[in-house]
Amino acid sequence: MHWYDTNGNPQYEIKKKDGGMRATTLRDARKHGWVPSVTTVMDIVGKPGLEVWKVNKAIESAMTVQRLVGETYEEHAKRILAHSRKESEQAAKRGVRIHNELELFFRKACIHSADMGDYETDIRKICDATKSVLDVNCGEQGWISEKSFCHKELGYGGKIDLYSKEWVIDFKTKDSIEDKKQLAFDSMAHQLVGYSRGLNGESRRMANVFISADNPGHVIFHEWPQDKHELYWNVFTSALDLWKHMKNYRPEEFNNEGS
């Protein structure tokens, strides 16, 4: 879970008593009046497609990971589960890495080149292709990268991949993207509208940019229809209200009391 303070600053970790750091919990958030992120809110809603994918990966791992001599059922099951999670963990790390490079690119900083060779070449292809598809579909924009915010009145926050006065953009990195394969799902629009309205309450055009990690330079732009923005917003605010009921925590009330 990700959290933000009332100034929009990320509060993903908190100091431990021994001086180290640990992930912020709901209990910590209650104490400080921190708000949940858009993605944390949307996690309260089931994702059937994702669950099917996880089950399929577990089945594949069960067929691949052989039971060792003398290994108990529980030990074997743990290895199968770890194997099934490995691919998604690697994909998540790669996605974070690409997001970080895109942030530098749109902030006009130098592309990170700690890993030289093919990696740097691939990253440049991804960044250039992303910029090109945005130029074609959005025109010239004053892009702002990785902006965090807090909507004090509704009690949620988040960090936006890219936005301007007219647009809110969220990047989605995938192993491969095929032109005829469905990439965009309504849950992505629910996430985007939370970002869009969370900035200052104004409506913006919303789009996902799907980025291929296996074929650097292949990107697909998907805009969400403007006539459905209000429907997406109703879904998001319903999820937000459900989250507050389930967690028995309304940060906007905490922060109003403290003001």
Listing of model-derived features with the role each one plays in the protein:
Residues M1-Y156:
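Metal-dependent nuclease catalytic cores that hydrolyze phosphodiester bonds in DNA/RNA
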Residues W143-E252:
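Mg2+/Mn2+-dependent nuclease catalytic core
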